[in-house]
Amino acid sequence: MNIGNVCIGKDEKIAVQSMLNIPAHDIQGNIDQAMKLKAAGCDIIRVAVPNLESVELIYKIKSFVDIPLVADIHFDYKIAIECANAGVDKIRINPGNIGDDSRVEAVANICNEKNIPIRIGVNSGSLEKEILAKYLHPTPEALCESALYHAALLEKFDFDNIVISIKSSNVNMMVKSYELVADRCN
C-alpha cells in the first residue's frame, strides 16, 4: 500500500510516522515542526484537522514539506472530504464517530476516487457501546470485532485501501488484538 511515495505493509521496510503537536491554527509552527521531523528521518506525518478552517493547514504543509501527510479526522466527515480534495495522502477516521453510513460512504467514495488510503483507528478507551455491552470491558476480541466491523463497512462501499490501527494501554491486549485481526484478514 502506498501512503504518498512511501510503501507500507508486507515486506516493506518499517516506515516511521510521527504526529504534529502544534495547534492547527499555528500554520508556521506546524510547517516548522514538519520540516524538523523530516530532517530527523520521519517518513510520514500525521496532523489533527479539528475543523474545516484547519484544512488550510494541509495545503500549507504540502506546499512547504515533501512528505506524505495523514489527516486525523474526528466527528465531521466533511473535514475528511475537504482534506482529500486538499491532497492529503491518507485519512485517519473512526467510522463509529463520523456519523451514519451515508457519511462513511461519502468519505469512502472520495478516497476511492483519489486513491487515498483510510486508516481505521480503534481504541480500547472508546469502543462502541454495543461492543462493550457484549464483552463487558475492552478485550482483544472486542477490539478485533470493532476493527473488522469498520473495515467491513468500508468494504460495503467498495473501498478496500484500508489500514487498521488498534490502540490500548495494555500492550498484551493490543498485541493479541492484532494477532486476531491478522488471523481473520488476508
Model features per residue range: what roles?
Residues M1-V47, N51-A71, F75-N186:
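Alpha/beta enzyme core
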